[in-house]
From Swiss-Prot:
<dbReference type="InterPro" id="IPR001781">
    <property type="entry name" value="Znf_LIM"/>
</dbReference>
<dbReference type="Pfam" id="PF00412">
    <property type="entry name" value="LIM"/>
</dbReference>
<comment type="subunit">
    <text>Interacts via its LIM domains with ELF2 and LDB1. Interacts with BEX2 and KDM5A. Also interacts with basic helix-loop-helix protein TAL1/SCL and can assemble in a complex with LMO2 and TAL1/SCL.</text>
</comment>
<comment type="function">
    <text>Acts with TAL1/SCL to regulate red blood cell development. Also acts with LDB1 to maintain erythroid precursors in an immature state.</text>
</comment>
<feature type="domain" description="LIM zinc-binding 1">
    <location>
        <begin position="30"/>
        <end position="89"/>
    </location>
</feature>
<dbReference type="GO" id="GO:0140297">
    <property type="term" value="F:DNA-binding transcription factor binding"/>
</dbReference>
<dbReference type="InterPro" id="IPR050945">
    <property type="entry name" value="LMO_RBTN_TF"/>
</dbReference>
<feature type="domain" description="LIM zinc-binding 2">
    <location>
        <begin position="94"/>
        <end position="153"/>
    </location>
</feature>
<dbReference type="GO" id="GO:0005634">
    <property type="term" value="C:nucleus"/>
</dbReference>
<dbReference type="GO" id="GO:0045944">
    <property type="term" value="P:positive regulation of transcription by RNA polymerase II"/>
</dbReference>
<keyword id="KW-0479">Metal-binding</keyword>
<dbReference type="GO" id="GO:0046872">
    <property type="term" value="F:metal ion binding"/>
</dbReference>
<keyword id="KW-0862">Zinc</keyword>
<protein>
    <recommendedName>
        <fullName>Rhombotin-2</fullName>
    </recommendedName>
</protein>
<dbReference type="GO" id="GO:0003713">
    <property type="term" value="F:transcription coactivator activity"/>
</dbReference>
<keyword id="KW-0440">LIM domain</keyword>
<keyword id="KW-0539">Nucleus</keyword>
Amino acid sequence: MSSAIERKSLDPSEEPVDEVLQMPPSLLTCGGCQQNIGDRYFLKAIDQYWHEDCLSCDLCGCRLGEVGRRLYYKLGRKLCRRDYLRLFGQDGLCASCDKRIRAYEMTMRVKDKVYHLECFKCAACQKHFCVGDRYLLINSDIVCEQDIYEWTKINGMI
């Protein structure tokens, strides 16, 4: 379960987003430090208001209010994506090396197969693929366009 983080501003020249912006800043209390929020910018998440520095992952402490970050909230814990996946994500197996892929690792997918980034390479020449490279999936083997004919011949497919 992920939650949206809203950025709010107390700039009087801006039109109010909701009724909270019409309240004096001293009435807003931070969900983290429990102090009044007098800052111009603050965050709203989990039905509470936060100083930008107070909204952080309960495990690793990284700031969750930064642009591009996502807040996951489960079992009363505020978590970053990596810690959420580490605790609640499902691990899998790489289709190439049969070793464990942790839920938070970056992977490549082809149809129903999942690969470590370092395992996503041509089975014939071992070249790693770049964006736009063409390849063929043969069973769990990935073969680059240049090696398809040779690979299928060697493996008795022609």
